[in-house]
Amino acid sequence: MSIDPASRLRKFRYSDTKKVSKPKPVKHIKSKKTRTVANYEGLNDLNPSVQPDLQVLFVGFNPGVESSRTQHHYAHHTNLFWKLFNQSRLLFWVLERNGKTNNKDDLLLNQLTINGESHATAVNDFELIKYNIGFTDLVLRCTKSAQELTMQEKLDNVPRLLREWNLAQAKKIVIIGKGIWEIIIKKQGIKVQRFDWGVQNNAYTQWVCSEAGIESDIHVLPNTSGLVTSMNFAQKLALWNEIKN
């Protein structure tokens, strides 16, 4: 009895073939990236410029390499701090509050104010203490980026920072960077739930002022680093102008 071709084909396909197991997928194990620690040997901390009864105290995250090298705040040429400082005319506002509108005999002011415009730069930071404008940082240690600071190091510096605020008793405390404000609040074990740029009027502010023993207006402004582009210059300048209110 002959087997028809169709039956022979079915017999071959279902009876004579062996099951072939599918190869298991190979898992690719990602190699762990090792975090390199930058060497900043030879770069010194940048000292604060703080004294009692300041009109304005600026607070940065920590000094960058250029600021450490030159020993001046916001010294990198891409940083917008001094451009915002000058265009906001904050120096003139401070002079009015100090009652120093006549600068004829003040050689430094004659250099800083030319034809009714402010021309301050990083090299003037420590000189501005003469007009009750001060500078400090959350962390005084130099790094290329604030991301290189550990959370513990940032938290450990909050008490020192608040002591400086207490000494300064500044009318306006201007924090350059939202992250600084969040660290100060985190020190109390609280996470910021709601945030708006500019002057801070909330329970967080009340706690910070109580801890520092101050009655200052606290303004939180965007970081002025050239690496931060989330807000354009005009928007940043508008927030700086609010300091004078």
Roles of regions detected by a PLM:
Residues 58-65, 87:
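Short, conserved active-site loops that position catalytic residues or coordinate cofactors/metal ions
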Residues 1-48, 52-55, 75-77, 84-87, ...:
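C-terminal capping/extension of enzyme domains
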Residues 54, 64-69:
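Short N-terminal binding/cap micro-motifs at the start of the first secondary-structure element
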Residues 161-181:
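Proline-aspartate-enriched helix->loop->beta-strand connector
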Residues 55-56, 172:
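Structural motif
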Residues 62-66, 79, 140-143, 178-182, ...:
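Short, solvent-exposed loop/turn segments at secondary-structure junctions
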Residues 67-153:
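Short, surface-exposed acidic-centric catalytic microdomains
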